[in-house]
Amino acid sequence: MADGLNRVHYNPSTAQLVEFALLRGEGELTANGALVAKTGTRTGRSPGDRFIVKEPSSAADIEWGPVNQAFEPGAFEGLWARVEAFLADKELFVSDLEVGADPEHYQPVRVTTQYAWHQLFARNLFIIPEEFNRQDKPVWEIINAPDFVCVPERDGTNSDAAVILNFAERKVLLAGLKYAGEMKKSMFSVQNFLLPAQGVLPMHCSANVGKDGDTTLFFGLSGTGKTTLSADPKRFLIGDDEHGWAPGGVFNIEGGCYAKCIDLSQKNEPVIWDAIRFGTVLENVVMDEHRVPNYKDSSLTENTRAAYPLEHIAQRKEDNRGAEPHAVVFLTCDVSGVLPPVSILSKEQAAYHFLSGYTAKVGSTEIGSTSAIQSTFSTCFGAPFFPRPAGVYAELLMKRIESFGSQVYLVNTGWTGGPHGIGKRFDIPTTRAIVDAIVSGELKNVETVHLDTLNLAVPVAVPGVDTNLLNPVNTWSDKALYAEYAQKLAEAFTKNFAKYQVSDAIRNAGPKA
């Protein structure tokens, strides 16, 4: 990006970016010191507008389809040039950042944004290195031009906006989008493509570590509890959303957190509550007349967010890294009310449930999602972000679990006693008690009961949890109806899993329809 007539601010500080954002009318300051910005009509990710350039160096390794849509190299060149021309006379913000808190597996990235608040977001979510690009790797480039309007007939896009990844040229283009989450997820997709070739499993999970150095991972889609459960006052946070698992340890891909704010309370989520202060970006959060954020207000979107650097969390692992995990938790939000609150999985069951990624779209991060809650299967608990075929990630997971001996658990943060609308959702204290028992190792060799239809082993007792909750059939007043719903869920699993080419051992580890 030429530094000609336009003013370019290199590596600006938090205070400078907040000032610029306020002066330029990009946002407002809240009573707690955070910067609130609104993202217009797109208040979540736009999966229909995400593309990967189809070029010889990467084409054979990508699972092309509705998630990874192909974009022509020539069309990309033209669009990139038009966006550069559009930004040529604009004031711009540029930072040299990194993705991946690991000396071997990081990627250097130069982020250029039209908006000051987007630059603040990038500096909060990516890693600000002490010394940029120590290994002198080729640098990735992100350009974010939210005011550029794409023209599908001219640009080859599907709408007025696009997110395009180009692996050959190490470029990410964001045009016509104000929702900042697209920036972080685009670099996550980049690492999800690059890391497996280095023998590293990229994961859509949160991670924390205990005083004794024991690491726990929490996999799950948006709204299932990854951020809430990993922000544990008794443990040290590694990160809340994106990690790599290499032989020998786990590392955060990011340098910050992107926490959901809907119904946020100091009582239930003290770590997140305290992290929202000066330097934090609040996305689409509504304020009252005294500028106090009203976290209950979903009038703009259910998907309200807080973006803050890990430095805002007192109890964190300062190097953003941890040992290999003793415990791995798959968080699922079961809207049918059928799954138990906790199950203990074999490694084959772990691969089955990892590939299935069964959960619900709760406060979905995708545009057009309303509060209607529906069940979904999202491969690897993050289908929208994984460019390679699912089997690549499942095999890496099995390999890591086997070589380290990690124990995997399936934890339901959804409903019990009936489906959504009839049953009730497990409360956070119940799930926390289950997680406490998992991380302390109390569930490692316990007595279990086998649920035949679901093909799951359920502990008969968990410290601090009402025993009646553990076997889901006990929470339903109509036992026949429970059996019917369990059968329906087993059939949904089997139907979804038919597309995977896996060993019989893995296929037979799922529910029995």
Curated annotation (Swiss-Prot):
Please give the pathway this protein is involved in: Carbohydrate biosynthesis; gluconeogenesis
Q: Which InterPro entries match?
A: PEP_carboxykinase_ATP, PEP_carboxykinase_C, PEP_carboxykinase_N, PEPCK_ATP_CS
Q: Which residues bind substrate?
A: 45, 179, 185, 305
- In the Enzyme Commission scheme, what number(s) does this protein have? 4.1.1.49
The entry's free-text remark on the cofactor is: Binds 1 Mn(2+) ion per subunit.
Which UniProt keywords are present, listed alphabetically? ATP-binding, Cytoplasm, Decarboxylase, Gluconeogenesis, Lyase, Manganese, Metal-binding, Nucleotide-binding
Q: Which SUPFAM superfamilies match?
A: PEP carboxykinase N-terminal domain, PEP carboxykinase-like
Subcellular location, record wording: Cytoplasm
A Gene Ontology biological process noted in the UniProt record is: gluconeogenesis
Residues annotated as binding ATP? 185, 204, 220-228, 269, 305, 431
Q: Which GO terms describe its molecular function?
A: ATP binding; metal ion binding; phosphoenolpyruvate carboxykinase (ATP) activity
* NCBIfam families in UniProt: pckA (TIGR00224), PRK09344.1-2 (NF006820), PRK09344.1-3 (NF006821), PRK09344.1-5 (NF006823)
Q: Which family does it belong to?
A: Belongs to the phosphoenolpyruvate carboxykinase (ATP) family.
What this protein is called in its record is Phosphoenolpyruvate carboxykinase (ATP)
Per the UniProt entry, what species is this protein from, by scientific name?
Shewanella sp. (strain MR-7)
